[in-house]
Each structure stands twice: as structure tokens, then as C-alpha cells.
């Protein structure tokens, strides 16, 4: 469990540090362009979840994120699996959840600032922005979830049926 919490702590510290920098340098400045027409830093406060979707009050969001984080930690603890390939994706998701939970508890919403400007304009008469503004915690959650999907067979290998058949 030491590595699980170590990885998660790194995510939380990096997330909170970058959010403090965003508050300090971006909140009153607007947008800072890093790579023209592609990457910007834009301060935003998000009351919802992914893509700004709001579906519940902050109290319910805090309860939901806290419960999911607790379930992840308990699952990893009870699994007994201490392989890095197993711990890393769960610690990224856990750390990202805790990072955003800290924002909800202290600020009342999540601070976002990384903005990929893939396309902004009108489609069929409606203004659209094809990529949300996000943060380090969101990135960690997404990377952890992608690892679980893409590496599923390596993280959760099937039991060797040949070995089981020989035991009988």
C-alpha cells in the first residue's frame, strides 16, 4: 500500500501546486497562450464533473467523490496485489479524485486551467468549444482509466487454466 499512497500523494501535490499557480498567475489575467492555436492556460472554475456537466449539488458531489475514493483505496487494500502495474492506475485515479475533492472542500468548485484549443467556433449556428479546460487531477484520472482499459489483460491476467487442469 505504500506505493499506492506514494503515487497518489505525488498526483495530489502536483495538482494542488499547479492549481495554486493558476490562481496566482491566471485568475486575473485571462488566457496565456503557450502554443498558438493549440495550447493555452485559461483559468476556470468548474462546479460540475467532466466537461463541466452539473448533475448534483456540491454536497452530493463531495459525498460521491469521497465515497468513490474510499472504495478505490479499500479495493486496492483488500486485493493484496502489490504490483506496480496494478497500483499505478488506481493511484492515479485516487490521487486525481482527492485533488479535485480538496478543491470542492476548500473553494467550493474545481479549479481548471489547461486548455487545448482544438476548435472553437460555430457548428450549425451554435458556438462550440471542442475541448474542455481541465487540470492535473483530471489528467491523472483519465490516464489511470485509460491504463485500466488498455492494459486490462496485463493488470488482471486470466488464471492459467492449464495449470488448474493438471492439479485435478
UniProtKB/Swiss-Prot annotation:
The keyword Cell inner membrane applies. Pfam families: Peptidase_A8 (PF01252). One of its GO terms (molecular function) is aspartic-type endopeptidase activity. GO terms for biological process: proteolysis. Its main location: membrane. The chain crosses the membrane at residues 57-77, 85-105, 130-150. It is found in: Cell inner membrane. It is an enzyme of class 3 (hydrolase). It catalyses: Release of signal peptides from bacterial membrane prolipoproteins. Hydrolyzes -Xaa-Yaa-Zaa-|-(S,diacylglyceryl)Cys-, in which Xaa is hydrophobic (preferably Leu), and Yaa (Ala or Ser) and Zaa (Gly or Ala) have small, neutral side chains. Keywords: Aspartyl protease, Cell inner membrane, Cell membrane, Hydrolase, Membrane, Protease, Transmembrane, Transmembrane helix. Its EC number is 3.4.23.36. It is a multi-pass membrane protein. One of its GO terms (cellular component) is plasma membrane. The active site is at residues 112, 138. Pathway: Protein modification; lipoprotein biosynthesis (signal peptide cleavage). This protein specifically catalyzes the removal of signal peptides from prolipoproteins. HAMAP family: LspA. Belongs to the peptidase A8 family. This is Lipoprotein signal peptidase. It comes from Chlorobium limicola (strain DSM 245 / NBRC 103803 / 6330). The gene is lspA.
Amino acid at each position: 500500500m505504500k506505493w499506492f499512497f506514494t503515487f497518489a500523494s505525488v498526483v495530489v501535490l502536483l495538482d494542488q501546486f499547479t492549481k495554486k499557480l493558476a490562481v496566482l498567475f491566471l485568475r486575473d489575467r485571462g488566457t496565456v497562450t503557450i502554443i498558438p492555436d493549440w495550447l493555452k492556460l485559461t483559468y476556470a472554475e468548474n462546479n460540475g464533473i467532466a466537461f463541466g456537466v452539473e448533475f448534483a449539488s456540491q454536497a452530493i458531489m463531495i459525498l460521491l467523490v469521497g465515497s468513490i475514493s474510499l472504495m478505490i483505496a479499500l479495493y486496492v487494500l483488500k486485493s493484496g496485489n502489490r504490483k506496480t502495474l496494478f497500483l499505478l492506475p488506481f493511484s492515479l485515479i485516487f490521487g486525481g479524485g482527492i485533488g479535485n475533492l480538496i478543491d470542492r472542500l476548500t473553494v467550493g468548485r474545481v479549479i481548471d486551467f489547461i486548455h487545448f484549443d482544438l476548435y472553437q467556433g460555430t457548428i450549425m449556428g451554435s458556438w462550440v468549444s471542442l475541448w474542455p479546460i481541465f487540470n492535473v487531477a483530471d489528467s491523472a484520472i483519465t490516464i489511470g482509466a485509460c491504463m485500466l482499459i488498455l492494459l486490462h489483460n496485463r493488470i488482471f491476467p486470466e488464471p492459467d487454466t492449464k495449470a488448474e487442469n493438471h492439479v485435478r
